[in-house]
Amino acid sequence: MFKKVKCLAFFILSFVCCLGTTEAKEMKAEKSIVVIETNLGNIEIALMPDVAPKTCENFLGLVNKHYYDGIIFHRVIKDFMIQGGDPTGTGAGGASLWGKNFEDECKSTVSFNKPGLLAMANRGPNTNGSQFFITTVATPWLNMRHTIFGEVVSGMDIVKKIEGAQTKQDRPVQEIKILKAYPKS
């Protein structure tokens, strides 16, 4: 009899532990949505920690430090992408969560095959910092050159609105600002 009770207790405990793990995974998945509030509307992005864990850690860490709050989209190119994440607003600034550049996490399992992909802007291999871009069209020439780490799940109309802004030398004439960025709760 004691053996049966022990076996049943083990089964129940195992089930409860597995249930807790599933709930934790679901909570983590929910928390990997980041909202970027702009002066033109909100963009929601699902991060891809399974594809680019260090890049997602960097981005989410900067989001949680309010690093992107008040930063402009400094580069907008029609039929290509919108770019932000540089606190100087020049395209030449921005540091990673760790204060230095970090390595690419390019994977052949993801590609620039559609609009709405979030990727790291860089100045060459392994020069990732804080700058990112969102594609507005498929951009296959960027495959294996920039780390893809997220995808727009809501607000692609806002991305397109930003893309359509009047620019001078790829810089919006009127400021398009990230008011704040935060994990969706």
Residue ranges and their predicted role:
Residues 2, 6-7, 11, 18-185:
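Cyclophilin-like peptidyl-prolyl cis-trans isomerases
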